[in-house]
């Protein structure tokens, strides 16, 4: 599922709804906020769900700047500092990243973790564009929520 435009009601996870509302707040009446408008201290409980990528042009490439702990756990590795194309299984992901750079609006995606050893898991990705010059996307923030199976050892007895 690839949905745009989106409203907060379209987002099923509380963590991603909170991140979307915060992005809207710091955006104000602009097309998109600057990365400097985002202060991690304003949303500390959301940090494990955040991925931040730099957008490079000529040629267009994406570099993982920051990866939250929920994503490193889902991937079973940390790809901070690496380029998107160096991670196997990310061709479809690059299409969505190109889309947000060109369209400059948020989107919601639901799919399988084809870029992870845990490709059987479902996840949600909330893409949020950021711009230093107010016109061009130079960073993308993703809120990522993984549909991890419940571990029977962690479920309290009934």
Where would I find each of the regions flagged by the language model?
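Intrinsically disordered, low-complexity terminal regulatory regions
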Residues: 1-158
């Amino acid at each position: 599922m690839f949905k745009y435009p989106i409203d907060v009601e379209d987002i099923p996870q509380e963590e991603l709804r909170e991140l979307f509302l915060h992005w809207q707040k710091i955006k104000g009446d602009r097309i998109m906020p600057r990365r400097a408008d985002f202060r991690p201290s304003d949303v500390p409980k959301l940090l494990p769900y955040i991925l931040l990528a730099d957008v490079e042009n000529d040629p267009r490439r994406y570099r993982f700047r920051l990866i939250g702990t929920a994503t490193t756990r889902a991937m079973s590795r940390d790809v901070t500092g690496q380029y998107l194309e160096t991670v196997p299984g990310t061709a479809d992901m690059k299409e969505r990243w190109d889309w947000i750079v060109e369209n400059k609006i948020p989107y919601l995606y639901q799919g399988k973790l084809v870029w992870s050893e845990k490709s059987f898991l479902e996840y949600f990705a909330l893409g949020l564009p950021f711009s230093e010059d107010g016109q061009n996307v130079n960073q993308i923030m993703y809120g990522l929520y993984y549909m991890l199976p419940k571990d029977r050892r962690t479920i309290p007895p009934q």
